[in-house]
A protein has these predicted regions:
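Domain-level signature for soluble enzymes in the chorismate/prephenate branch of the shikimate pathway
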Residues: 1-198
């Protein structure tokens, strides 16, 4: 059986679309990916492993996938034994702290004693600790931006692309913490095999 390079990618969404565009641009032709978790290439010894983005770092770290394409934000949050081998220049966003509009914001110390909702507690905790801020981190998945509006939190720490979701939820970005984009990752210390076109 032919050895194939297994690439873990996000199974849907913007990162999926842009990753497929990159592979197409590189000349990689895939078979249909409808409802299939493992999709082989028709012209390279490559197969795609379709996963949720937050599962990609673990799949690469454990050797389930040889390499992965995922947002830097997920690499930092999951803190697995992977290394970034190349930034890919697409799916750019940032992780930021945001608070309700019309809030008097004197600076980062505003967050002391406040409750912050996020899906990225590892990154947020490190940022707050590094800056001497003692806040309560409330972990939620999905729809983080509604937390202040329903009284669940005083602020949020979340992904921001255009900022329109913040505006529509009456929030304003006050601290840009990390710039993120799609990156190529491999397990720490792993040596990649040669990949030749069929």
């Amino acid at each position: 059986m032919e050895q194939r390079l297994r690439i873990a990618i996000q199974s849907k969404g913007r990162l999926y679309d842009e990753t497929m565009g990159l592979l197409t641009e590189a000349g990689v032709k895939m078979t249909s990916s409808k409802r299939t978790l493992l999709v082989p290439s028709r012209n390279f010894p490559v197969e795609l492993l379709m996963l949720r983005d937050d599962d990609i770092p673990d799949a690469v770290a454990t050797g389930t996938a040889d390499i992965g394409i995922v947002g830097l934000n997920e690499v930092l949050e999951k803190d697995k034994a992977v290394e970034v081998t190349a930034p890919l220049g697409f799916s750019r966003c940032r992780l930021s702290l945001a608070i309700p509009q019309h809030t008097d914001y004197p600076g980062l110390n505003w967050f002391n004693g406040r409750k912050i909702a996020t899906s990225y507690p590892v990154i947020l905790r490190k940022y707050l600790n590094d800056n001497g801020i003692n806040a309560d981190i409330h972990v939620i998945t999905g729809s983080v931006e509604i937390a202040p509006g329903i009284g669940l939190a005083d602020a949020i720490f979340d992904i921001v692309s255009s900022g329109s979701t913040l505006v529509s939820n009456n929030l304003v970005e006050v601290e840009k913490v990390i710039e993120s984009e799609a990156v190529l990752i491999q397990a720490t210390g792993r040596i990649m095999p040669d990949i030749k076109r069929k």
